[in-house]
Amino acid sequence: MGAFDFLKNFLKKSRGKNGKEGPCAAAEKKEEQGPSSDLIFEEFSAIQKNAVSIAYSHAGQALAPGKSKIGGRPHVPQGFVWPYFEGADFDNVVKNRPLAFLAQFDLAEVKTFDKDDVLPAKGMLYFFYDAETQRWGFDPADKGCARVLYYDGDVGALSAAEFPDDLPAEYRIPEQRLVFSARRELPDWEEYAREGRAIGDWEEYDDARARFGCPPTEEPDGVHKLLGYADVIQDEMTEECETVARGIYCGDVRSDLSAAEKDDIRARAEDWTLLLQLGTLADDDFELMWGDCGCIYFYIRRQDLRDKNFGNVRLMLQCT
């Protein structure tokens, strides 16, 4: 049975035998009419996104320059300068620290799995983050705690950079080879639940998305992917990205924003899309966790992604 057939039967919960409504169901139907399966199918088809899932395994030996990977030393062009960030750690010690190298992606390799055709067709994409301070991302001052660099030159000119001497060993991720796959996704309830949506109940929504073939993720910290929708642990993050990008702290409820400002932020939040999600990274006796079983999420404006402008990416960290 296909996704449409499942959805077509989705809301027929109050049917009796032989498909006939019982007396209670008939009475309830007058008070509350659920959305049609056709409407749900049309909405899901319109909002679904493709994600590039990432599976990793220990590399064993150094990978060739330009290969997609997590950890190890980044393969960079001549003149590369390792990014640093000045911020406070968990003991409130403020200093300039080197960012941990997280991953690099050969976009020509990834492109096969980018079914929505939103990433550049070629080049290298590098991700860095201050793993020592683990900034949450909801403070405008956190800008720079994560960096995304793009290189579209000759891959043959790349070579492995040396780790900075002041980068602690616990943030030097062992090199991992990657395997990609494509999968379609729907947003988690926190991101879906906006005015005018077809479904107004989270349990009903999770049931419907499972029937559509996009069930919610049970353990987000085990998910690593490019694109798609974030596996939300706390709250929806696109509004936070837009708020912080305007220089507004959003670590608490903002009561001083006008209704018009809040409406504009909510509207502009639609411009933001997930670029990368990383959960806990582990290899034998190495483990790098974000908070307590959390994830880090890199978000980018759609127009910036089209323009290959990765200088305004925002990072968000969520954990349990």
Question: Which residues does each predicted region cover?
Answer:
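Preference for intrinsically disordered or flexible, low-complexity segments
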Residues: 3-11, 15-320
